[in-house]
Amino acid sequence: MATGTDQAVGFGLVAVSLIIFTYYTTWVILLPFIDSQHVIHKYFLPRAYAVLLPLAAGLLLLLFVGLFITYVMLKSQKITKKAQ
C-alpha cells in the first residue's frame, strides 16, 4: 500500500504531466489556427521551439539510457572478471 507521501508525489507528477500535455497540445495544435495578433500568443514560445524542445528532451533521454546501459555493462564485466 502506498504511503501518503507516495500518493502526494504521484498526484504531483500526474498534475505536472497534465499541465505540460495541455500546454503543448494547445501550443502545437490550436495556436496555428488563432490569429497571430491575439493575446494568447504572448503566453507561448515561438513555434520553432515546438520541435526543438521535444527533440532535445529525446536526445537527453537517449543519452542517459545509453550511459546507464554502458554503466551496467561495465559493472557486469568487472564482477565477471573478479569471479574468474
UniProtKB/Swiss-Prot annotation:
Keyword Transmembrane included in the entry's annotation: yes
Keyword Lipoprotein recorded: no
Subcellular compartments: Endoplasmic reticulum membrane
Keywords carried by this UniProt record: Endoplasmic reticulum, Membrane, Transmembrane, Transmembrane helix
Molecular function terms, GO-annotated: dolichyl-phosphate beta-D-mannosyltransferase activity; enzyme regulator activity
Pathway(s): Protein modification; protein glycosylation
Transmembrane segments annotated in the record for this chain: 11-31, 49-69
Gene Ontology CC terms, in alphabetical order: dolichol-phosphate-mannose synthase complex; endoplasmic reticulum; glycosylphosphatidylinositol-N-acetylglucosaminyltransferase (GPI-GnT) complex; membrane
Membrane topology: Multi-pass membrane protein
InterPro entries (alphabetical): DPM2
One biological process term in Gene Ontology: dolichol metabolic process
Primary location: endoplasmic reticulum
Quaternary organization: Component of the dolichol-phosphate mannose (DPM) synthase complex composed of DPM1, DPM2 and DPM3; in the complex interacts directly with DPM3. Component of the glycosylphosphatidylinositol-N-acetylglucosaminyltransferase (GPI-GnT) complex composed at least by PIGA, PIGC, PIGH, PIGP, PIGQ, PIGY and DPM2. Interacts with PIGA, PIGC and PIGQ.
Function: Regulates the biosynthesis of dolichol phosphate-mannose. Regulatory subunit of the dolichol-phosphate mannose (DPM) synthase complex; essential for the ER localization and stable expression of DPM1. Part of the glycosylphosphatidylinositol-N-acetylglucosaminyltransferase (GPI-GnT) complex that catalyzes the transfer of N-acetylglucosamine from UDP-N-acetylglucosamine to phosphatidylinositol and participates in the first step of GPI biosynthesis. May act by regulating the GPI-GNT complex.
Similarity comment: family membership: Belongs to the DPM2 family.
Name the record gives this protein: Dolichol phosphate-mannose biosynthesis regulatory protein
Annotated source species: Mus musculus
